[in-house]
Amino acid sequence: MKKIRIFATALLLAFTLSSCESFFDVELDDQAKIEDIFRQKTEVQKYLSHLYSYIPQEEEVVGMHGWTVGRSDEALFSWYQWVYYTQFRTGNYSSATTNFNYWPDYYIGINQCSIFLKYIDLDKEDTPATLAYMKAEARFLRAYYYFLLFRQYGPVFIWGDQIADETIDGKTVDRHTVQQNIDFMVGELDAIKNDLPVRTDDIGIDGKQWAGRVTRGAALALKSRILLYAASPLYNGCDLYKGQMQNIRGEFLFPQSKDETKWEAAAQAAWDVIELAETGLYDLYKDTEQTDEFTRYMSSYQGVRLKPWNKETIWGWWSRSGVYSWLGGTGGLLACAMPGMTGASGAVYQGYGGIQPSLKLVDSYPMYTTGRYPVTGYQGENDMSKPIVDPQSGYQATGFTDGYKQPGIDWGDGIKAHNSCINRDPRYYACLVPNGFWWPNKTENIKFTCYNNDACTNKWNAGEGGGITRVGYVWRRLYETNKSLREATDYTTMKTVYPAFRLA
């Protein structure tokens, strides 16, 4: 009886294994092959759209694709707990740091672009002009992803037209030189610029439906940016790299001597963009509604970001947000910059107060009357409290003025303003709200106050985790005057374009 049970068990096991094998055996003959994908116009368009998906969210202020503000010296975060940017501000990072590691993403994007270029000629449904355009787009994006690698990691390995190895290891791979990187990227852009339309409408593609697709202006602008990098001191005979860093072929990765002709090449590339703009394609954004000159300048500066796809934008994309996506791409950024307004009505109105301008940035705005920059330096290396003032600028570092009429505010009473905030360039007031100034919303009718909470914001406390303004200024660049922010939809309906390249 025992032998019968063993035999039955073995028979059942054999049947089970046979069933499993037949279940996992897949007939691949009926599976779509990559060649089949590229024979269908709609699938080709999907694949092309996918190539754009590797563009990082540079406009994001938090999360793994963001914190660019906090990593710069132009702004401050009140957030200093559970945030990644502090690793870079404090120098606490190494080759093992995983935060902000875009290396694999960009090489995957490069690989996908090369695959697209390998198979695109199988598409017999699109016109020759459209095919040429899509090829040029893929080559542009491939060059752009190399540029992003170069910008963050310096010279990298160039695959050319080969299908890139997505697992390439930045710690062990042998790199091409700076000049080889520059030559490849610029060569790609030169090769495709005439295949890219000046406008997508020129080849029958709806520019509104396909907003953000690459055009000739984008290629010229990227070339200009790359050649500017090549001419800059870091990549043009920098003493730091002399006699250092060679690849396996014995080539120095960085140029060993300065080449002044690189500035000529950079200037010519920039001029090529300007010449294209002068055909009427691009222009500086100018407000046409405000009658007061000063207010018009303020509105023009804000409109560069608040008016989507205006003529100043050469190439960009709709603003996105990862961490605060529930507030929308633009709303998420604005909410992070908005002060926590305790005196305002509407619970949603409470901003996070997480981003503030640095005092160094505040001091960089010129004076309106003289046009001179008021602060030329500081007496202490890291002490911003003792600025070196240009006496001919008209700037006053101390004292207050009573009854000052705030620019752009035609409904509020005069305020007691610090003299350092008076008679500044219109861009100053378009970007900043200093301590004691009206928040630019006549419905709320409140003032921004940084150091007490009886009017607008909570007092900064260094012991708290953030969310409170640390300096005497807050951002308002993306805040449109008098815009209501009482509901979540007031944030989500805001749509702005992030300009990767603009005429300015």
Give the ranges of each region predicted by the language model.
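Short, flexible loop/turn elements at secondary-structure junctions
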Residues: K3, T42, Q162, S319-S321, ...
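Bacterial Sec-dependent N-terminal signal peptides
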Residues: M1-D29
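Flexible, polar/acidic helix-loop-strand segments at domain edges
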Residues: Y352-R502
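Membrane-proximal, proline-rich intrinsically disordered regions
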Residues: C20-T68, M245, Y404, I422
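Short coil/turn linking the two alpha-helices of tandem helical-hairpin repeats
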Residues: F150-R151, P155-F157, Y229-C238
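Polar, glycine-rich mid-to-C-terminal structural blocks
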Residues: Y229-A231, D259-K405
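Conserved, well-structured interaction surfaces
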Residues: K41, Q45-E59, G63, Y80-Y153, ...
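A solvent-exposed, charged loop/short amphipathic helix patch at secondary-structure junctions
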Residues: C238-S257, Y451
